[in-house]
């Protein structure tokens, strides 16, 4: 399953003619295309593990900076756990390279997290990094394939460090040049060294973004 989504997306892309890959709106929230200097976008996503609201601003042609607020009902995407929690994160995206047919970027979203379970509060720090590839399939459709490592650590006598390794893909459909609807999927194991075990983690989120 972990290999299925990226494999299907790659197969579809290889079947497209070269001219179909030379288009796009020139920006993205989920993929690697940055917003552009001076542009700002608001975004919202909902699904599993929760609700996320974000704002992102283009400080240069290759760098976006912003922030995110998340209210989760699934603990960091663990499919077996439904503890409510909140996260406050910074948001950095750096475009590494870009051509007419593909772009590459790194993201970093650090910030504190709090989960509430049976009257206790687990406090931790999220330090997620991700590598994403963006492919403009048409003027209205952007595909992304990514490897995410949303590392986080809980303080005190709690869970300790958690090392998720998630893969997957996503789609952004541009309703017009400023408005996009999206779906993003990542899944994989979340390794918990202190427990000597792992949990299956998944992010499946529908979203919308507006750039101005």
Label the model's feature ranges.
Residues 19-74, 209:
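Short glycine/proline- and aromatic-enriched beta-strand/turn motifs that initiate or cap beta-hairpins
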């Amino acid at each position: 399953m972990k290999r299925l989504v990226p494999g299907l997306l790659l197969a579809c892309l290889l079947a497209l003619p070269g001219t179909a890959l030379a288009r796009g709106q020139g920006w993205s929230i989920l993929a690697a295309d940055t917003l552009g200097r001076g542009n700002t976008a608001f975004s919202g996503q909902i699904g599993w593990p929760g609700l996320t609201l974000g704002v992102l601003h283009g400080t240069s042609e290759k760098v976006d900076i912003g922030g995110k607020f998340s209210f989760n009902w699934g603990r960091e995407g663990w499919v077996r756990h439904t503890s409510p929690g909140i996260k406050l994160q910074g948001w950095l995206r750096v475009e590494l390279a870009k051509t007419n047919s593909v772009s590459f970027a790194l993201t970093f979203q650090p910030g504190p997290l709090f989960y509430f379970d049976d009257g206790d509060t687990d406090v931790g720090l999220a330090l997620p990094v991700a590598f994403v590839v963006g492919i403009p399939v048409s003027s209205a459709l952007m595909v992304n394939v990514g490897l995410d490592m949303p590392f986080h650590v809980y303080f005190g006598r709690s869970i300790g460090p958690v090392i998720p390794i998630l893969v997957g893909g996503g789609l952004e459909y541009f309703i017009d040049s400023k408005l996009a609807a999206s779906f993003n999927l990542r899944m994989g194991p979340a390794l918990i060294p202190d427990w000597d075990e792992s949990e299956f983690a998944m992010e499946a989120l529908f979203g919308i973004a507006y750039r101005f």
